[in-house]
Amino acid sequence: MALDAAVKQSIIKDFATSEGDTGSPEVQVAVLTQRIKDLTEHMKEHKHDFHTQRGLLAMVGRRKRMLTYLKNTDINRYRALIERLGLRR
């Protein structure tokens, strides 16, 4: 389940550190967080969709690694990001 292009562009615009920024950890984590939320809703309705469940767990792991990287490189950006996204940490 891919994100709608308009939603993805909106997220990129909100979290970009500069014009045209799509690769910063903040943008990547924000996009992954939205995809995780969407797939979580999908899984509530389709409990036995194991392919989606596996993809969801992979995304959660990828987001966790990116957050760990950001925490190790710049703790202030990390704290600002988890507060903006409402992630518990």
Swiss-Prot record:
An MF annotation (GO) of this entry: structural constituent of ribosome
Q: Which InterPro entries match?
A: Ribosomal_uS15, Ribosomal_uS15_bac-type, uS15_NS1_RNA-bd_sf
Name the domain of life this protein comes from. Bacteria
What GO terms fall under cellular component here? Answer: cytosolic small ribosomal subunit
Keyword Ribosomal protein on entry: yes
Keyword terms of this UniProt record:
Ribonucleoprotein, Ribosomal protein, RNA-binding, rRNA-binding
A GO biological process held by the record:
translation
What sections of the sequence does the record tag as coiled-coil? none
Q: Where are the transmembrane segments?
A: none
Q: How does it assemble?
A: Part of the 30S ribosomal subunit. Forms a bridge to the 50S subunit in the 70S ribosome, contacting the 23S rRNA.
* Family per record: Belongs to the universal ribosomal protein uS15 family.
The record describes the protein's role as:
One of the primary rRNA binding proteins, it binds directly to 16S rRNA where it helps nucleate assembly of the platform of the 30S subunit by binding and bridging several RNA helices of the 16S rRNA. Forms an intersubunit bridge (bridge B4) with the 23S rRNA of the 50S subunit in the ribosome.
Q: Which NCBIfam families match?
A: S15_bact
The record's HAMAP family line, in alphabetical order, gives: Ribosomal_uS15_B (MF_01343_B)
- Protein name (Swiss-Prot/TrEMBL): Small ribosomal subunit protein uS15
Organism expressing this protein natively:
Arthrobacter sp. (strain FB24)
The uppermost taxa in this organism's lineage are: Bacteria, Bacillati, Actinomycetota, Actinomycetes, Micrococcales
